[in-house]
Each structure stands twice: as C-alpha cells, then as structure tokens.
Amino acid sequence: MNKIIEMDFLEISNLIQSGKLQVCVIGIGRIGLPTALSFANSGLHTVGIDINPTLVSNINSGIFPLKDEPGYDTIFENVLKEKKFSATTKIEDIVPSSDVILLSLPTPMDQNNIPIYSALKSVSQQLHDLLTPGSIVIVESTVEPGFVEDELISIIEGSDGRLKAGKNFGIGVCPETANPGQILNDFERLPRLVGATDDKTANIITKIYKHVFTVDLIPMPNCKTANAVKLTTNVFRDINIAFVNELAILFEKIGIDIITVLEAAKTKYNFQVHYPGAGVGGPCLPVNSYQMLNLAKKIDKNLLSIVKAGRIVNESMPQHVINLLTEGFLESGKNIIDSEILILGASYKPDVKDIQLTPAEPIIDKLKMLKCKVKIYDPYFKFTDIFGIKTENNLVDALTNTDAVIIVTAHKEFHDLEPAFLKSRMRTPILVDSRGIVDRYAAKKAGLIFRGIGRGKI
C-alpha cells in the first residue's frame, strides 16, 4: 500500500490520477454500495466489504441489488467488467493493503430510541488490528457530533501506541447527503462536507472526493461540526413535517384543505414547503432526531424540547390515519371489525424499496388489533411477505371487494389512480389518502367516502 498520509500533495495527485490509490468501503448497503461504485467508476480500484455473504456473492456474480437507484446499474456493469470493483466478507484481507478506508455502516436505534453504534465500534476494533500506518479512515455514517472524536478514534488507536490519529493515520468525516431513489443524481450535484482531526487529512480527503464526485467540497473545522450540519438539515425537516402535520389536523376540524394552503404558501419566496403524511420513516430523519436528542440530554435534558415534540407528533400520525379510517366506516354504516383493508404502499417513501421504520407497519399493527383483514400492495414488494402478510401482486385483484383503501406511500403508480376505478372495484368505497395525491372533489363525485390528512370533509 501507499502511505498516503506521509505523501505531499503532488504525490497524492499522481497516485489518484494513475488509479493506484487503493480504496475499500466497509458496509455496502443503500449508501455504501453506490459510494463504492462511484469510487470505482472514477478509476480507483475499490473493494466493498460486508458481513452479508449473500449480498457479496450476488454482487460478485453480477447481480445488482439496488434496482430502484437509476444509473448505478450501468456503472455496476462497467466497473465489474473493468475489474475496478469487487466485494468480499473478509475485512482482514483488504484493510491492511488499503490506502483509504470508508465506513458506511448503519446507525439505527434501539427500542428506547437510543442510537446504536455497535457496527461502527466493532469495525473500529478490527481497524485497530488491521490498519496499516499511513492510511486514512473516512466516516460517512451519520453519527452524533463528538462521537468520532470522543469514542471512535480511541477505539481505533487502542492502548498499545501503534496508531495515533493525525500522526501516523488520518481520520475524517464526509457525511453522505444522498436521497434514496436518486443517489446518483445527488452525488453529482450536492456539495459535500469534509471535517477531519487535522488539516492535512482534511485536504487529502477533499482532493480524493473532488476526483470522485466533482462537486463542491465544503471544509468544516472538525469532524463534529460536519456531523452537526448533517443532523441539523434532517432534524429541521422532521420538525417542519411535524408542524404541517399538526396544522393538517387543525385544518381538518375547520374545513380548510392543507394542500391548498401549502400550494399557495410556497409562492412566497422564503417559505420552504413540507407536506403532511402518515408518519416519517426511513433510516435517517427519525434516527437523526433521536441522535440529536441523545446528544442534548448529555448536556441538558431540557434542551431541544421542540425536537422531542416533533417526534411525538410524527409518531402519532399512524393513529390519526386509523382515526380517519374509523370516521369513514362510521359514515358507511359498516362495522370495521372483519373488514378488508388494502394498504397501498409499504415503503417509507415513494419509489424506493425500503421499509425501514415505515409508518405502514404501525398502521398495519393497529388494523390487526381492530380485527381487520389486511392486504398490502406495493409495486416494489411483490411475491414476498412483509409484516407477516403475503403481498398482493396485482393492483386490480388487490382492490377487488375491499372495504377500504389506505394510501400510505405516494408511489408514482398510485398518482394515476382514478377514483371512479377504485369505486368500481371496492365492496365498501372508503378511501383514506394520507399523502394528498387524490383529488378530493373527484373522489366525492365518484361516490367514494373520502378522508385525507388535512383535507377536511366535502
């Protein structure tokens, strides 16, 4: 390997341009795999490391796992063919010969909403034994500010004196900012943040990322500031979604349509529009809010009460969807018990195959408690089981003889649903639109019993 941390910038530039820089990405999931492919596509020999042997085997066999990430399928084919990218489960075979080690590992939370950093800590313990002096570690995983400086570095360094951050290895962060479903587009246009424990490491990371992504690289004074920016952007969104969710519930009660309000409000130049919905899911926003809260309670448990309130609101929205459904059944005169309910969309967001922390799950759990028969149709989850339910493979068949439909995810396929068509297939014509994609007047005209978050009665 090359001792990149000891090189001057001309040597580093030559190393990058020649394609001799050796890169490994530990964790090749939703973000890690596209990241690794981007590095390989830039001409750098890249190895993806993951503990999932099936994923690794499929990748090495040419099976691309992220069908909902446009553009990366072609890149995947090309870098495999050019032998610029491969995958392995054997971290011990790759890390010692790598110049740059990227960490793209999950940071979920436990039942008590405490962030779990066990994957990062476990890998860092391995890095202590495997890292060759002169290399650079880059943390792309989203962590709370201070975690890298206060915990991760000491794990990698250990107590034997072999490794010392800023002396014989570099460590920095470049938090990912991509939106699942459009990762390539985001990687090609969104600025990236770079923070490190020392200026030279920060400059080397900037030079490497500039070669790979050709976007603006924004220097941060340290790792914790870069991580704070990443969390701030996502917590901001979580809080604003909570605000419009509460507005939606208020407006329902006084006959104002939240969608009409928001569409008009966004004509004001400094209004950043957010939309109400069945809840906020995925591996980012809910987790990031709790990461920030976890940090705050170490300082002062009274700080960030607005974030806490936002989480309470957003986590209450699945119950509000059930309340709207119950209203619909009352209007229909039919008992909700033993009724057949179709969930449209299981993913936490439109047009991706991902059910992490999706609001569909608590909605389904509540329906089961009401003794409803639940069906699920999601174009990204056919011929499979999720939440203990075998998914429907055909939308028309799924709709037939249902008593109610709940739109949970605004997949493109659902935007074109005609209310009259829904009415013609259903036994009891109750529609709950939690994403504001159905024209409520068209729904009423078609004879549907319509309820929507923030839509009011018509």
Which role does the model predict for each range below?
Residues N2-I458:
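Structural/interface elements that position substrates and couple domains in central-metabolism enzymes
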